[in-house]
Design a protein with these regions (language model features):
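S-adenosyl-L-methionine
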Residues: 21-61, 91-124
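Conserved SAM-binding motif I beta-strand of class I
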Residues: 83-88
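C-terminal substrate-binding/active-site "lid" region of AdoMet-derived donor-dependent transferases
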Residues: 135-160
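Bacterial N-terminal signal peptides
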Residues: 4-15
Length: 160
């Protein structure tokens, strides 16, 4: 009986520590997990590099990734010296992206915010990258058309 009580006590006392460890690390995102407007599917790094090349991203740019997920496009732009901003609705993905930027040493150039891309001002961007479905691209069209002339927009896979 004492052993059972001791085991039960040990298990109960260890739970707060386990919960604290979980709270410190964001959960690993799953490909295909549903989000507010779309499912999360990460863009391969090689394709991100091609998108940034196509936009001719330099250190003089302000890059915005709409639906930034785990932050890989923002981090890649920051590694090129650009000031890069990720707008992502999923708070866990924002935490993952922020941790990834810190791990890659670009936290000073890569920022992430939990926000609705349809209600957030990103008009100061010189480059916009996105990987969204066509209906979302169409919904974003008015915001993008109101951006400054010369703003480069690169959409992965789907037309604007």
């Amino acid at each position: 009986m004492r052993l059972a009580t001791a085991v039960c006590l040990a298990i109960c006392l260890s739970q707060p520590a386990a919960l604290a460890q979980t709270a410190q690390r964001p959960a690993k995102p799953l490909v295909g997990q549903p989000g507010k407007d779309a499912i999360w599917v990460p863009t391969p790094s090689a394709l991100i590099e091609m998108m940034l090349d196509l936009a001719k991203v330099t250190a003089a740019d302000r890059v915005v990734d709409l639906g930034s997920g785990d932050g890989r496009a923002v981090i890649a732009a920051a590694k090129r010296g650009a000031n890069a901003r990720g707008i992502e609705f999923d708070a866990n993905l924002v935490a993952v992206a922020t941790a990834n930027a810190a791990k890659e040493g670009v936290s000073d150039k890569a920022t992430f915010e939990r926000a609705d891309m349809f209600a957030t001002d990103f008009s100061n961007a010189t480059v916009v990258v996105l990987f969204l479905l066509p209906d979302l691209n169409i919904k974003l069209r008015p915001s993008i058309l109101n951006m400054k002339p010369g703003t480069r927009v690169v959409s992965n896979t789907f037309e604007m």
